[in-house]
Design a protein with these regions (language model features):
Chain B
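Internal alpha-helical transmembrane segments of multipass membrane proteins
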Residues: 23, 321-342
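Hydrophobic secondary-structure segments that place a key small or acidic residue at a functional site
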Residues: 106-116, 126-257
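Short helix-to-coil transition segments within interhelical loops
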Residues: 11, 358-365, 443, 452-453
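Mechanotransmission and gating elements of multispan inner-membrane complexes involved in transport
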Residues: 92, 212-321
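Short helix-loop junctions at transmembrane helix boundaries
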Residues: 384-424, 434-447
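Transmembrane alpha-helical interface segments in multi-pass membrane proteins
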Residues: 331-334, 344, 351-398, 427-428, ...
């Protein structure tokens, strides 16, 4: 495991995000003092349902903008970029694995991975996409559409897609949430292994104690508030 | 992977909606193209058809009817004019050529036209193009035989009128025997559709249009002596007989003069015969309006310029064309709305896909382009299919058109207007895709990425 004292990949300071609730009053979901991840770190972030874990990942990915505070990913504060530049930055620097896989149904496994490359500048081309699918054990499923894959296989495709542009930071939002225990463990092991081999920093959010227990570095969201 | 691949994947994923909306665009474009092709083709053929017919002279009535009857073998003859007028025109220094025509019979719906051998020898139905024989020869024509036929016809008319008045009919002295060869030269379409061959005999029916009650001239069958090469004009659909044989048979009597010629011509010389119309070619176009006025000053005849009459006809028909084109455009607009509705309807499932693409790094503008490109692609493919379809429909209909009218529309001819239709389809696609594309542009990524419960 790489030393967490390496160059920081993610730095969050005084991060705040609020939503208006149904009655129109502001509801603060995120108020995070400081958080940092180094190159190659593998950290699990835990918290209760509705505690703002997914919102935090969306803030880091630049999908949502914070009300205040600072986010630095790989030395860049994406909130200071234009929206288009932020999108390009996200494609090149952040891989995202979702609980519900979020594969495009009309595209094959290989095409889904190629889509991951497309917006980040086509890093490595089709060869890398095939190689990634081989790494997740799907070399025989390259041209299958998601509907023809098991849920475990679908999440493997999602992992390959998240790593398509070799991003320094991989965000995983409950990646085992839709899988059974056996599949969940296999997928988690694969994700950690590929991230570890490639030196990708992994931030995984979950409320599953079993997933938590497999990580050395566990951070509770409420401790950061 | 590129944008167009994403677009085609989207279209394939919603194949039924894509197919239906694309088909509606194709139908609208095919209809518009077919209307344009038919309109231009018919107008071109009609205008081309008038090229050899500088001026047509016939009985007073509708000039358009006279033109349709003489030039296109359509409609009925407005009446007869005197043979004397024909002779006068033939001898007029301003006239280069005068060809008489008489109509009144048909064979299987094909008009039988009585004329002289001048029609084959000197008449150019289009500049530089005379009727040419594919087989056989032209019919024999002798002017003395025609004069004799006129006498016979006048005598029959006199006998009939006496009978109608209840007077005793005194038989006319037997005319000196004159040979009236019943010979016919048939147009290429007539030969093709009736199967008549050279040397074969046929029996004509009275009237210019077929009718179950029509009297057949069984006593005088005509013999095919020549078959013309295709001209792609009304000539192909006509049977030409010598004028003397036309007046030799029962039923083709000289009509009582409807109106007198100019008073100075009235009594001096009895009218020897009649014809339905005369086609006149002038020595120079400068004589056209003088002769036109002279003829129209007469009480028994009128002159018409076929080209001018056809232009007038198409000015009227043009309004119907515009109406049909408006209908085609309406179909296109409805197709555009259908595309917009179809994409809108799929937006709920698309929003998740859009959110995924955004999470993967796609810009809002990229998402906007994908949706817009999809609508434009459907329209362009639909329009392209419609363009080809329109030409194919006209090409397929040409067989029927040829049977019905004797000419074909150049189905492969691409008109400039068709490129405008394609441009309109692109604009229509862009307009119909604009609303859904804006919706896609505004998609809330975070909300649509959340797992659906």
């Amino acid at each position: 495991m790489p030393d967490s004292n390496n160059k920081p990949i993610l730095q969050l300071r005084n991060l705040r995000k609020s939503y208006r609730d149904g009655s129109g009053s502001l509801l603060e979901v995120i108020h995070l003092r400081q958080f940092e991840l180094g190159t190659g770190d593998q950290t699990v972030l835990v918290g209760q349902s509705g505690s703002g874990k997914s919102t935090l990942l969306n803030l880091i990915a630049g999908i949502l903008l914070p009300d205040g505070g600072e986010i630095v990913v790989n030395g860049v504060d994406p909130t200071k970029l234009s929206e288009a530049a932020r999108d390009r930055f996200r494609a090149a620097n952040i891989g995202y694995v979702f609980q519900s896989f979020n594969l495009l149904q009309g595209f094959t496994a290989l095409e889904n991975v190629l889509l991951g490359q497309m917006f980040g500048g086509g890093h490595g081309g089709a060869d890398r996409a095939v190689e990634l699918l081989k790494k997740v054990g799907l070399e025989h499923r390259l041209h299958h559409k998601p509907r023809a894959l098991s849920v475990g296989e679908q999440q493997r495709v999602a992992i390959a897609r998240a790593l398509a542009n070799a991003p320094p930071l991989v965000l995983a939002d409950e990646p085992t949430g839709s899988l059974d225990t056996k599949n969940g463990a296999a997928v988690l092991g694969l994700l950690r292994q590929i991230c570890g081999d490639g030196g990708h920093t992994l931030l995984l959010v979950t409320h599953d104690p079993q997933v938590m227990s497999s990580f050395e570095k566990v951070v509770r969201l409420e401790d950061l508030q | 992977m590129n944008l167009f691949k994403i677009v085609t994947k989207n279209m394939r994923q919603r194949a039924l909606a894509t197919w239906l909306t694309g088909t509606s665009v194709a139908l609208g474009v095919a209809l518009a193209v077919a209307i344009l092709l038919i309109k231009q083709g018919v107008q071109q053929r009609f205008e081309q058809g008038t090229l050899g017919y500088e001026m047509v002279i016939g009985a007073k009535g509708s000039p358009l009817q006279l033109v349709l009857n003489t030039v296109y073998n359509l409609d009925i003859s407005p009446g007869n004019i005197s043979w004397k007028l024909f002779e006068k025109l033939r001898d007029d220094k301003r006239v280069k050529l005068a060809v008489p025509f008489s109509v009144g019979d048909n064979y299987h719906g094909f008009r039988i036209v009585g004329t002289t051998d001048t029609f084959f020898k000197d008449f150019e139905f289009e500049p530089g193009r005379k009727p040419e024989l594919a087989a056989g020869r032209i019919f024999n024509f002798k002017e003395d035989a025609l004069k004799s036929a006129f006498q016979e016809a006048a005598e029959r008319a006199r006998e009939r009128e006496s009978k109608e008045r209840g007077e005793e009919v005194t038989p006319a002295p037997e005319p000196a025997p004159v040979e009236h060869p019943f010979e016919a030269v048939i147009g290429s379409t007539v030969a093709e559709q009736t199967g008549l061959t050279n040397g074969e005999k046929f029996i004509a029916a009275h009237g210019v249009q077929p009718s179950a009650e029509a009297k057949e001239h069984t006593e005088n069958p005509w013999t095919v002596v020549g078959i013309l090469k295709p001209t792609h004009t009304a000539v192909d659909r006509a049977i030409y007989i010598n004028l003397d044989s036309f007046y030799h048979i029962e039923g083709h009597e000289l009509r009582s003069p409807t109106a007198a010629a100019k008073p100075e011509e009235k009594d001096n010389d009895p009218d020897p015969g009649q014809v339905s119309s005369i086609v006149v070619k002038l020595q120079s176009p400068i004589f056209a309006f003088g002769l036109y006025r002279e003829i129209n000053d007469r009480e028994d005849a009128m002159a018409a310029f076929p080209a001018a009459e056809i232009r007038k006809l198409f000015d009227i028909v043009g309004n119907i064309d515009r109406l049909l084109l408006a209908q085609a455009i309406l179909i296109l607009v409805v197709a555009g709305v259908a595309i917009a509705v179809s994409i809108y309807n799929s937006m709920s499932e698309r929003r998740r896909e859009i959110a995924i693409l955004r999470a993967l790094g796609a810009r809002r503008a990229t998402i906007f382009s994908i949706v817009l490109l999809e609508a434009v692609t459907i329209c362009v493919i639909g329009a392209a299919v419609g363009l080809v379809g329109g030409h194919l429909v006209v090409g397929a209909a040409n067989g029927l058109l040829y049977k019905a009218s004797g000419f074909v529309i150049p189905a492969l001819h691409v008109q400039t207007l068709e490129w405008y239709i394609l441009a309109v389809a692109v604009i229509l696609g862009a307009i119909s895709g604009l609303g859904p594309a804006l919706g896609a542009y505004r998609t809330d990524v975070a909300r649509n990425l959340a797992p659906s419960s």
